[in-house]
Design a protein with these regions (language model features):
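A short acidic Gly-Thr/Ser loop motif
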Residues: 16-23, 84-86, 197-200, 205-213, ...
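Envelope-exposed proteins and targeting segments
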Residues: 12, 39, 140, 211-213
Length: 241
């Protein structure tokens, strides 16, 4: 995934994590087969700029993004973002295994009303073919991801105004899992025996934000389980007081 993002025409890429309290960023560079972390930045967002992951105070978020841009001190403009929350829907569907990707896309659009509880014109819909189904012969498992257009469009507009160009919009929990898979594979390529063994066990990652907690588990390059909870450090610190 990361190698595809950092193709020859995209030597630098900024990963943006837009939270409810902070904006975090990393600047990545691809050099041959290696990905290098060039810079990191973190800026607070004044006030309560979000309500249930929807942007309410565009000016506060814009100021934080401008500070991020200055902190990275580079000319890179292309960014990767991810979204989460109740406006994001992930669902597993089962489709005929003899369909091409184009046929699969057409079939998903035809069945969208029964698969996604929102009108097709109100969402962005994407899918990924996971592989043969163990439960249903001659079927393939397909992961569907849908998000309200407003959630994506508001972020794209704001990022564009600040001077960023959005290259990738992903789902947070799957971006987390893909990063875990990628770096596990990168560790294995070093020929470290411990890294090879680590790739053959279940690996987990927890991302704890101010208002959300995300968990993912991967094994041998595959996502086993993901879960998102609508509580984070705000609730945890209150409970500990």
């Amino acid at each position: 995934m990361f190698n595809k993002l950092l193709a020859k025409n995209t030597q630098h890429l900024i990963g943006l994590d837009i939270g409810t309290r902070y904006v975090k960023a990393i600047l990545l560079e691809q050099n041959k087969q290696h990905i290098t972390l060039l810079a990191i930045a973190c800026e607070s967002i004044n006030g309560n700029a979000f309500a249930e992951r929807e942007i309410k105070d565009f000016e506060a978020l814009s100021q934080a993004l401008k500070k991020i841009k200055l902190s990275l001190k580079g000319k890179a403009k292309q960014v990767a973002i991810a979204v989460s929350g109740q406006a994001v829907i992930n669902k597993l569907a089962y489709m005929d295994d003899d369909l091409t990707d184009i046929e699969l896309e057409s079939q998903i659009e035809l069945e969208a009303d029964s698969l996604i509880p929102y009108p097709l014109e109100e969402i962005y819909l994407d899918f990924e073919r996971l592989g043969p189904s163990a439960s249903y012969p001659s079927k393939v498992e397909v992961l569907l991801s849908a998000v309200h257009k407003d959630m994506i469009d508001s972020r794209l507009t704001l990022l564009n105004e600040v001077g960023f160009e959005t290259k990738i919009a992903d789902v947070e929990v799957y971006a987390l899992a893909n990063a875990l898979i990628h770096f596990a594979a990168a560790s294995e390529s070093t020929n470290d025996n411990s890294a090879v063994l680590a790739d053959k066990i279940v690996q987990c990652c927890i991302n704890i934000g101010a208002s959300q907690l995300q968990f993912c588990a991967v094994y041998d390059g595959q996502v086993l389980y993901t879960k998102e909870h609508n509580f984070g450090l705000d609730v945890l610190t209150q409970d500990s007081c």
